[in-house]
Curated annotation (Swiss-Prot):
The keyword Iron-sulfur does not apply. The lineage of its organism: Eukaryota, Metazoa, Chordata, Craniata, Vertebrata. Its main location: cytoplasm. ADP binds at G42, G94, T95, T96, S97, T162, K163, G411, G482, E483, E497, K502. Residues 1-24, 526-545 are annotated as: Disordered. The modification Phosphoserine is found at S11, S170, S243, S244, S252. This is T-complex protein 1 subunit gamma. Component of the chaperonin-containing T-complex (TRiC), a molecular chaperone complex that assists the folding of actin, tubulin and other proteins upon ATP hydrolysis. The TRiC complex mediates the folding of WRAP53/TCAB1, thereby regulating telomere maintenance. As part of the TRiC complex may play a role in the assembly of BBSome, a complex involved in ciliogenesis regulating transports vesicles to the cilia. Pfam families: Cpn60_TCP1. The modification Phosphothreonine is found at T430, T459. It comes from Macaca fascicularis. Disulfide bonds join C366-C372.
Length: 545
């Protein structure tokens, strides 16, 4: 028989936690993350100021932006941060609510785990609750007419009121709606709204926010390559290239042996002829503007300038795609294959302006632009990046409504309605599952509660009366007025949220809670500093452990 030596299965420098300790650790981590962000919900939300590792400052109240900047160690906290990113990419809104909800779902589950209830029971109750939440949401949702621009502006406005941009809300709403309507693109009955690719936000410090606008076209941060080229062209013919107008060196390395000096001049001549040929291929089509993603040599500039063609070089690929969508040009890879229908004639004006101390090329007044640039002006970089984030959210909200025109009441009203429906359903349930199921209803109330807290009103009194209100008939739209902290019918205030955002918020929050409840063991391998040295001479060592 072996002595009582402990058997080491895991190597010594790994840390292992298991059982209840892990679950409460995960729940606490999730609660901590939720607490950081709790004050960022609603119109009376606070801003957070973060220093990034480079020493720059980020000022924001956008849930996702805050969590992106925070460095966390706990694995559960990392997955919480991940869900806000998913939410942001998927629907663009609800990044703050999803974290608060997930944190609350876990926090109500802690009580059951302490009573030795098995996590699986809690999980199956949560899953049931999620299905009922989704069906209740769909019941209280109302359809919306996407051509009614007042209604659309109202929806975007309720997403913007919680942001820093709320002072210029009508301007921001119009910008967002305009931009999204521009990039909307229907093909064989399939709607495509790609904000990321085709609605670019360009920030130029200086001026005031009221100067911001949506351009019917594209703006790029470039100047002409030669000072004597035209800087103002009406109805330009635009050619887009993604090849360079320079002498092309071969792919493989080549050596040339020169015996006579005429050969040397001949080689130079060949280079010139090649470039001249390239330029002639382009000049044949009589374009006014040539825009390329690569370089343009001095000689090519000279030929183009003599033909009175404006050239712009080293444009980003994404910008080039946008110009193509805006003016109807095709991007060509080989100048010798240029055809008449590759030329873009959809733009009404090309002009190059100097703003501040940089030159910008504007391609505007497009006939039917399918891409646009949003020009933002403002006092400082920090303000501009916050406004940009807010605008992105507004555009996402607008996109969601256009793709799925269903709305649910905002201001905590839909949470209360769903919570009420769940509480009613749980009365008919028997067995252990009814308690966690009812707890989900309780967890949902965190949204209206936080809204009340952020206004500084009395939470208990208002929540009780809101609960009472929801037990009455036809009161599904009663919620909290985030400005004053009083109870209102949000239908009259016009606070609506897209159904898609709410559904995603609930799904993500419950899924995350379920995911973290499933974990009962964390093994973290720590790398010791001396680890690398012991690797080389560490073979005999390993046998002794």
């Amino acid at each position: 028989m072996m002595g009582h030596r402990p058997v080491l299965v895991l190597s010594q420098n790994t840390k292992r936690e298991s059982g209840r300790k892990v679950q409460s650790g995960n729940i606490n981590a999730a609660k901590t993350i939720a607490d950081i962000i709790r004050t960022c919900l609603g119109p009376k939300s606070m801003m957070k100021m973060l220093l990034d590792p480079m020493g720059g400052i980020v000022m924001t109240n956008d849930g996702n932006a805050i969590l992106r900047e925070i460095q966390v160690q706990h694995p559960a906290a990392k997955s919480m941060i991940e869900i806000s990113r998913t939410q942001d990419e998927e629907v663009g809104g609800g990044t703050t609510s999803v974290i608060i909800l997930a944190g609350e779902m876990l926090s109500v589950a802690e009580h059951f785990l302490e009573q030795q209830m098995h996590p699986t029971v809690v999980i199956s109750a949560y899953r049931k609750a999620l299905d009922d939440m989704i069906s209740t949401l769909k019941k209280i949702s109302i359809p919306v007419d996407i051509n009614d621009s007042d209604m659309m502006l109202n929806i975007i406005n309720s997403s913007i009121t919680t942001k820093a941009i709320s002072r210029w809300s009508s301007l921001a709403c119009n910008i967002a709606l305009d931009a999204v309507k521009t990039v909307q693109f229907e093909e064989n009955g399939r709607k495509e709204i790609d904000i990321k690719k085709y609605a670019k936000v360009e920030k130029i410090p200086g001026g005031i926010i009221e100067d911001s606008c949506v351009l019917r076209g594209v703006m790029i941060n470039k100047d002409v390559t030669h000072p004597r080229m035209r800087r103002y062209i009406k109805n330009p013919r635009i050619v887009l290239l993604d090849s360079s107008l320079e002498y092309k060196k071969g792919e493989s390395q080549t050596d040339i042996e020169i015996t006579r000096e005429e050969d040397f001049t001949r080689i130079l001549q060949m280079e010139e002829e090649y470039i001249q040929q390239l330029c002639e291929d382009i000049i044949q089509l009589k374009p006014d503007v040539v825009i390329t993603e690569k370089g343009i040599s001095d000689l090519a500039q000279h030929y183009l300038m003599r033909a009175n063609i404006t050239a712009i070089r080293r444009v980003r690929k994404t910008d080039n795609n946008r110009i193509a969508r805006a003016c109807g040009a095709r991007i060509v890879s080989r100048p010798e294959e240029l055809r008449e229908d590759d030329v873009g004639t959809g733009a009404g004006l090309l002009e190059i302006k100097k703003i501040g101390d940089e030159y910008f090329t504007f391609i505007t007044e497009c006939k039917d632009p399918k891409a646009c640039t949003i020009l933002l002006r403002g006092a400082s970089k920090e303000i501009l990046s916050e406004v940009e984030r807010n605008l992105q959210d507004a555009m996402q909200v607008c996109r969601n409504v256009l793709l799925d025109p269903q709305l649910v009441p905002g201001g905590g009203a839909s949470e209360m309605a769903v919570a009420h429906a769940l509480t009613e359903k749980s009365k008919a349930m028997t067995g252990v599952e009814q308690w966690p199921y009812r707890a989900v209803a309780q967890a949902l109330e965190v949204i209206p509660r936080t809204l009340i807290q952020n206004c500084g009103a009395s939470t208990i009194r208002l929540l009780t009366s809101l609960r009472a209100k929801h037990t009455q008939e036809n009161c599904e739209t009663w919620g909290v007025n985030g400005e004053t902290g009083t109870l209102v019918d949000v239908k009259e205030l016009g606070i609506w949220e897209p159904l898609a955002v709410k559904l995603q918020t609930y799904k993500t929050a419950v899924e995350t809670a379920v995911l973290l409840l499933r974990i009962d063991d964390i093994v973290s391998g720590h790398k010791k500093k001396g680890d690398d040295q012991s690797r080389q001479g560490g073979a005999p060592d390993a046998g002794q452990e």
